[in-house]
Design a protein with these regions (language model features):
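Mid-chain, well-packed structural core segment of small domains
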Residues: 58-90
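Short S/T/G/P-rich N-terminal loop/turn motif that feeds into the first structured element of a domain
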Residues: 1-55, 64-72, 94-118
Length: 118
């Protein structure tokens, strides 16, 4: 499994656009499934969070090769989907993610790089 991903976070639906938000969520899941089937991403998870007092209601985590993820992120389909999501949900954000063993490697490397600052 790859150690790189895209984190797509989102908040509550915009008032009056709840039905459209559900539709765009479904579009996103279908799009990610197509990307996986085509080999553009390795896998994806759609996550809804329980109420916690914050503004993050859920997220999608796409895993894949960083070069392929960059190509996905630059595609017209991706830009269209993010624009649609921003229209129906608050706080939509897309962030590159470093996962699993690569995250651990970076934490260890940061410890070594900052040891003299302690």
């Amino acid at each position: 499994m790859t150690n790189f991903g895209l984190f797509v976070g989102f908040g509550a639906p915009v008032d009056g656009r709840e039905t459209q938000a559900a539709r765009v969520f479904g579009e996103a899941m279908a799009y990610y499934a197509r990307l996986q089937q085509q080999g553009d991403i390795e896998s994806f998870d759609g996550v809804l969070l329980e109420a916690h007092g914050g503004d993050l209601n859920g997220f999608m985590l796409l895993r894949g090769d960083p070069v392929k993820l960059g190509m996905v992120r630059a595609s017209e389909d991706w830009v269209r989907l993010v624009a649609r999501a921003e229209f129906v949900a608050r706080g939509v954000g897309v962030v590159s993610a470093i996962l699993d063993e690569e995250a651990q490697r970076l934490v260890s490397a940061n410890e070594a790089m900052t040891a003299d600052l302690r």
